[in-house]
Amino acid sequence: MLIPSKLSRPVRLDHTVVRERLLAKLSGANNFRLALITSPAGYGKTTLISQWAAGKNDIGWYSLDEGDNQQERFASYLIAAVQQATNGHCAICDTMAQKRQYASLTSLFAQLFIELAEWHSPLYLVIDDYHLITNPVIHESMRFFIRHQPENLTLVVLSRNLPQLGIANLRVRDQLLEIGSQQLAFTHQEAKQFFDCRLSSPIEAAESSRICDDVSGWATALQLIALSARQNTHSAHKSARRLAGINASHLSDYLVDEVLDNVDLATRHFLLKSAILRSMNDALITRVTGEENGQMRLEEIERQGLFLQRMDDTGEWFCYHPLFGNFLRQRCQWELAAELPEIHRAAAESWMAQGFPSEAIHHALAAGDALMLRDILLNHAWSLFNHSELSLLEESLKALPWDSLLENPQLVLLQAWLMQSQHRYGEVNTLLARAEHEIKDIREGTMHAEFNALRAQVAINDGSPDEAERLAKLALEELPPGWFYSRIVATSVLGEVLHCKGELTRSLALMQQTEQMARQHDVWHYALWSLIQQSEILFAQGFLQTAWETQEKAFQLINEQHLEQLPMHEFLVRIRAQLLWAWARLDEAEASARSGIEVLSSYQPQQQLQCLAMLIQCSLARGDLDNARSQLNRLENLLGNGKYHSDWISNANKVRVIYWQMTSDKAAAANWLRHTAKPEFANNHFLQGQWRNIARAQILLGEFESAEIVLEELNENARSLRLMSDLNRNLLLLNQLYWQAGRKSDAQRVLLDALKLANRTGFISHFVIEGEAMAQQLRQLIQLNTLPELEQHRAQRILREINQHHRHKFAHFDENFVERLLNHPEVPELIRTSPLTQREWQVLGLIYSGYSNEQIAGELEVAATTIKTHIRNLYQKLGVAHRQAAVQHAQKLLKMMGYGV
């Protein structure tokens, strides 16, 4: 819940001097990316901008405090301010900020700018007190914001110092409007106006000018002088002389003498007590100070000129001038030290009553009241956890004594989930073990079951499926039906374990159950996770179309619940890329992989390993070895500079081994084969992939017998576990083994099996990457004209893809080839005496490559009738009557030239 006063522009007071000269300068603010107002405290920055903002509608205001260094809090308020300015235009971004469903501030801002692209009128965003931001991540994100914000948006920043926002670059590019302390300082005329509206007896212009000069036009000093003069303690000039040369850091003594010592004791205590509140309203004041009518008291303090300002148009929320507020808080620690804990407790209770638990925690921590802090956490901690208030929770839990955690195991569980969310798996188990050792009877009942559900999640994340299964089963046996969150966790873990074991049907059922429970209870990240797992399982079973449809459901869930910035989104777009690649939709596959990298842009580069491998796979399918090599250099650098799960390493190794196969790099393959992991089993699609990598390397090295043993065992496992996609891949690799070993009939047998199975999987690119060896076999099968219709159609499609991406020059009879052919001593006399034109040679090459007449016309960009003429001419010159004879003739020519076909 956001505090309204932080999003309210200060009310323009009646007795303030209108800064016409500065307002004139600000009138052109819409021509700049950034308007920067900087000065020490008390120069009137906020007052000036509130005057400028008066009457503007498309403006959002965000007043910072120290707590806004939390990235999530900063994001929530900033987006809320934009929503305020645009009347709710950025709904997607607002939901993402509220639910903390974004990877980073920069990715959230990128989404914001997408939505603002449809907002065409001028827009202003004011951020007050930016000097309070010390978080470098926020600074970097705001630099990104300024670089990419729409042209019609102006950011207005108020700060006591020069913020780290790339100011120099903006200044050089004339995109910065600056107002500093020298310009903010009051002129003689403004000082005269100020005193005239503050003092009952006007002072001479010369007098006010001298006072203005004495304090260098410092607005706070002028206000203090007016206050002293009204209280008749000193003449205005005496006060001015005393303040001359004093800056904001040396005001304490003056404020004690001239303000606190000149109010009655009740007002003094009111000021000191209320100052602990960063913002205040009637209810807070009544509870903290004991005053019966808080609103009336606040308005009275405001009338006395005691540096209190309204924060919103309703007049409900107030705050002290930062300079005066800091002074009062310091004095409160001196004068009311004994009462201070009780004052903070009262503030915490009042904030809780108004529904602001995070503000209440701030005061409970300040009070050092562990019991109050415990009670707040017991009631609100999980809500804060689900809203990613992780740093606040961590600070709060550290402030509680261990005994308090033991008395409330829910808080131990919360601390453990906090650790798990930060990938501190070892610490989770240590904490839970310690708690179980020290809490009586914890090893039985619901809490123990919740511990086990969390332990199961940690175990599966840490690569221990057997332990995860044991713990998940224990949790599900002990958890009551109403403990939905832990039941969702345990069910999901059990489904993932079965996935790892290759028990795909049972795993799919559990993941569907997880999805149903997660949707019912709005646990959206587990709903998304279950859909991703379902898609992977269906892919492994060979049901790629159903996997596609499941992915569509996942994308719909992401859009509906605004989960775009979750790291899991990368997982989804990556498996979508894998599916598109299998179907030879390479451009779309590459785009998906790149969008996955974009989702992870704010994470460590190592997290992008799998998407990078997918990009390399696309390059390999296109036969673009130069690009693949460039990307492989980066992939191998990442592999050498990170620790990865075995599945990730297997995927990375796949593209490396395929590249070595395509470039005949036997040395690299042999070196890799000596050092790579050889899994004990091959009972899931992850392990099958690694063993396939090994078999491919063995085939490249001519170790056919070893590779055949591996592939036959893989096929046996794949058939028994119904890993149909893996079986399809294995058959293709076995085909290459038989082809290279000269076992042509075996090669044809398994290729026919692979083509038949591809009717179910839809595989195209898995055939294509095998290159010319695959093309030669498919040409022969097509020439035999014995394939069933579906397999015939697929074979022709695969052949077209190979010809498009893996063209060898002899398939196209280029000029150099034809010249060497005509000079060959064994060339048929008919060709020598009646040579084909260059275009006819091209057509012959395409016929040999399996192209139809229409496809040849498309390839050469000529009319189909023209192609028919070329074919008729080349048939006549070659002395053949039909297409198959032309293919056989081309094959003879290629063999004569030394090509193994």
Swiss-Prot record:
Keyword Metal-binding in annotation: no
Binding site for ATP: S39, P40, A41, G42, Y43, G44, K45, T46
Keyword terms: Activator, ATP-binding, Carbohydrate metabolism, DNA-binding, Nucleotide-binding, Transcription, Transcription regulation
Gene Ontology terms describing biological process: positive regulation of carbohydrate metabolic process; positive regulation of DNA-templated transcription
Pfam families attached to this UniProt entry: GerE, TPR_MalT
SMART domains: HTH_LUXR
A GO MF term: ATP binding
Annotated DNA-binding residue span(s): 853-872
Activity regulation text: Activated by ATP and maltotriose, which are both required for DNA binding.
Domain HTH luxR-type: start-end pairs: 829-894
Superkingdom of source: Bacteria
Quaternary structure annotation from Swiss-Prot or TrEMBL: Monomer in solution. Oligomerizes to an active state in the presence of the positive effectors ATP and maltotriose.
Entries under PANTHER family matching the protein: DNA-BINDING TRANSCRIPTIONAL ACTIVATOR DEVR_DOSR
Record family assignment: Belongs to the MalT family.
NCBIfam families: PRK04841.1
Known role: Positively regulates the transcription of the maltose regulon whose gene products are responsible for uptake and catabolism of malto-oligosaccharides. Specifically binds to the promoter region of its target genes, recognizing a short DNA motif called the MalT box.
Protein name: HTH-type transcriptional regulator MalT
